[in-house]
């Protein structure tokens, strides 16, 4: 039996709700934030500290979930420079059309990410991304672990940044010399990763491999979950097969430390009331979604994020419009949902 959550008060639930309209951006989150071509991007840390290098980065929810959630908002032709992570990184195109490139110079592999698709780039693969659409776009990020570590940048990214007043320290602290900041006596600038170390660590993905790490909402694999109901469909995108949930493997079937599922509800459809043993985060992609938690109700609009209290009874419903959400759950093999009554 899943332990029941302390009955949440409305203020508790509001603290777990991140409205798209209330997102607090950081425009100097990373070493390349002033490099021409990358100087108009905004970084968001929704849940967890993420990998931002700026001490000014606002964190919306600090409660550990076992994974981190973030976001990036970029205008057309704005680039996030080549880098790699120590844990799994997946990102979902909520709006805009994106190109994701691999390789230290971005010339090894390429995949396009239209709105409503998701890509997961394995650890130690140099990756960068660019908004190639005509409007401002938003990427929603999922990073494995409570502490996803630090970003490793392609060597030329560090060199270019020096010309624009930003220096990354070995400690991970970002110094803005244009703002009058300076190094402490015991600090040293981060040197580019040695070539022999890159040769040993870096993983390479070409165009063919890149096609295998992208999944669209249409490719998500529907299954008869414990919370299925007429007009309510859950479908696997990230994660291995999970007999406890009767879930098939998603197209992206390797371990991430979390699973990602699409959840769609037709107008006036509703899920059964149920509990979950793991952290569960709901990101609304389209429509309007009502989430009832222990008798309280919250309405999500597109771009809103909500962290459901672990163990709390929850129910999802749509009213006049179809709702499509991206769901992130902790663990590679979440427990079966427990129906309430």
Tell where the protein language model's regions lie, with residue ranges.
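Glycine- and acidic-residue-biased ligand/ion/polar-headgroup-sensing regions
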Residues: 75-78, 86-99, 103-104, 277-294
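Double-stranded beta-helix
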Residues: 2-11, 126-209, 313-341
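Short acidic-glycine-tyrosine-enriched beta hairpin
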Residues: 88, 104-122, 295-311
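A short, N-terminal "cap"/entry segment at the start of jelly-roll beta-barrel domains
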Residues: 1-65, 169-257
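Ligand-binding pocket scaffold of soluble enzyme catalytic domains
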Residues: 68-70, 99-102, 108-111, 249, ...
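Conserved short histidine dyad/triad with adjacent acidic residue
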Residues: 49-57, 68-85, 243-248, 259-276, ...
């Amino acid at each position: 039996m899943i332990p029941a959550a302390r009955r949440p008060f409305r203020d508790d639930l509001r603290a777990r709700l991140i409205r798209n309209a209330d997102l607090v951006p950081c425009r100097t989150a990373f070493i390349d934030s002033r490099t021409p071509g990358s100087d108009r991007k905004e970084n968001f840390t929704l849940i967890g500290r993420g990998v931002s290098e700026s001490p000014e980065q606002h964190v919306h929810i600090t409660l550990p979930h076992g994974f981190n959630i973030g976001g990036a908002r970029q205008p057309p032709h704005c680039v996030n420079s080549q880098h790699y992570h120590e844990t799994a990184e997946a990102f979902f195109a909520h709006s805009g059309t994106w190109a994701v490139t691999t390789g230290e110079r971005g010339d090894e592999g390429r995949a396009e990410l239209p709105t409503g698709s998701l890509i997961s780039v394995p650890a130690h693969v140099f990756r960068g991304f660019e908004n190639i659409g005509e409007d401002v776009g938003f990427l929603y990020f999922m990073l494995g672990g409570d502490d996803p570590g630090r970003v490793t940048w392609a060597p030329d990214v560090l060199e270019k940044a020096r010309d624009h007043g930003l220096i990354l320290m070995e400690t991970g602290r970002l110094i803005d010399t244009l703002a009058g900041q300076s190094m402490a006596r015991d600090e040293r600038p981060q040197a580019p990763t040695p070539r022999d170390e890159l040769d040993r660590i870096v993983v390479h993905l070409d165009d063919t491999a890149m096609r295998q790490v992208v999944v669209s909402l249409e490719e998500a694999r529907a299954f008869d979950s414990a919370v299925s109901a007429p007009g309510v469909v859950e479908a696997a995108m990230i994660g291995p097969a999970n007999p406890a949930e009767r879930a098939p493997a998603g197209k992206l079937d390797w371990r991430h430390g979390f699973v990602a599922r699409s959840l769609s509800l037709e107008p006036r459809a509703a899920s059964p009331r149920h509990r979950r043993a793991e952290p569960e985060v709901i990101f609304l992609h389209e429509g309007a979604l009502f989430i009832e938690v222990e008798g309280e109700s919250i309405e999500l609009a597109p771009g809103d994020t909500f962290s459901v209290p672990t163990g709390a009874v929850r129910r999802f419903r749509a009213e006049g419009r179809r709702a499509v959400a991206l769901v992130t759950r902790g663990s590679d093999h979440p427990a079966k949902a427990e129906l309430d009554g």
